[in-house]
């Protein structure tokens, strides 16, 4: 587990400890007591990790395990990879590892192992969690289980609402520019990179550890559709910043990207539909130079909005 700043303040360290205690208790006998202690009465689970699977399973009468998924994956172990904290926020990046041995949102047990990423954005007040926002790599999960999105009785699919909120890039940069310090400078570099989608601001030796639309990119190449060209497929694409965190040498940014599907996307013909999904980016700096990034987009959400949830499965 990598901490963005292992020498963070006592207050931030307390927030991190509460967040990790909450996460590590899930599915254990200690969970009910831990939740009573670390979840505020006003706690808002703004987004669940399996957001799309849960939404599409709603009202179908399928047996499903509920919030913590332990009935479907009883040997689940979450492997923490990254931790960041700033102000009242804590971010956790972890891998969900488990064996699928129980019903899961309409998917019968497969006996297969999974190892997928999930990210959590948490807010705390007085040492308790008041908000949780989670996103799991649901496409990777379905691919590893070897299944498609379960069919609903009505034959339909439940697409997510357009993620279109957040702060304009220019406004975000101007706000950060009023805080002249290294952390703000790093955030400015990351925010400005979303103005053109051209990868500006990265050092020559920059490494991309994960592309945001990694599954669509791989599918597009494998299916003979060439490199994934989001800007051609969504020519009016624009991004808006939901939240940023900076600590030590690391910047986290959650933003919404969207527009009109006006061109071919990995072989999906233009639909004219409006799309908009959340994306998380983790950027690492050395001496003010952006040297590494890891990006994770809600690809299943995008495909649901296009009416093509199974195209890469």
Where are these regions (language model features)?
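C-terminal and inter-domain tail/linker signature
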Residues: 1-313
């Amino acid at each position: 587990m990598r901490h963005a700043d292992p020498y963070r303040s006592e207050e931030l360290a307390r927030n991190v400890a509460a967040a990790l205690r909450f996460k590590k208790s899930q599915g254990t006998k200690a969970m009910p007591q831990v939740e009573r202690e670390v979840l505020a009465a006003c706690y808002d689970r703004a987004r669940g990790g399996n957001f799309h699977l849960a939404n599409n399973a709603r009202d179908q009468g399928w047996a499903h395990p509920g919030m913590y998924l332990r009935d479907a994956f009883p040997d689940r172990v979450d492997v923490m990879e990254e931790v960041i904290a700033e102000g009242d926020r804590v971010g956790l990046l972890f891998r969900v590892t488990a064996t699928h041995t129980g019903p899961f949102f309409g998917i019968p047990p497969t006996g297969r192992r999974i190892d997928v990423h999930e990210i959590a954005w948490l807010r705390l007040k007085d040492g308790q969690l008041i908000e949780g926002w989670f996103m799991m790599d649901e496409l990777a999960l379905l691919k590893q289980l070897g299944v498609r999105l379960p069919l609903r009785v009505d034959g339909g699919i439940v697409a997510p609402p357009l993620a279109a909120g957040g702060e304009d890039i220019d406004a975000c940069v101007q706000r950060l520019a009023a805080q002249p310090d290294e952390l703000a400078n790093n955030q400015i570099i990351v925010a400005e990179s979303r103005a053109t989608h051209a990868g500006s601001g990265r050092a020559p030796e920059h490494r991309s550890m994960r592309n945001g639309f990694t599954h669509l990119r791989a599918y597009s190449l494998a299916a003979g559709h060439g490199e994934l060209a989001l800007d051609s497929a969504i020519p009016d694409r624009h991004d808006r910043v939901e939240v940023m965190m900076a600590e030590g040498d690391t910047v986290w940014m959650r933003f919404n990207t969207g527009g009109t599907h006006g061109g071919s996307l990995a072989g999906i013909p233009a639909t004219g539909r409006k799309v908009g999904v959340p994306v998380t980016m983790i950027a690492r700096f050395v001496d003010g130079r952006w040297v590494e990034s890891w990006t994770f987009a809600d690809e299943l959400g995008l495909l649901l909005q296009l009416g093509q949830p199974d195209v890469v499965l």
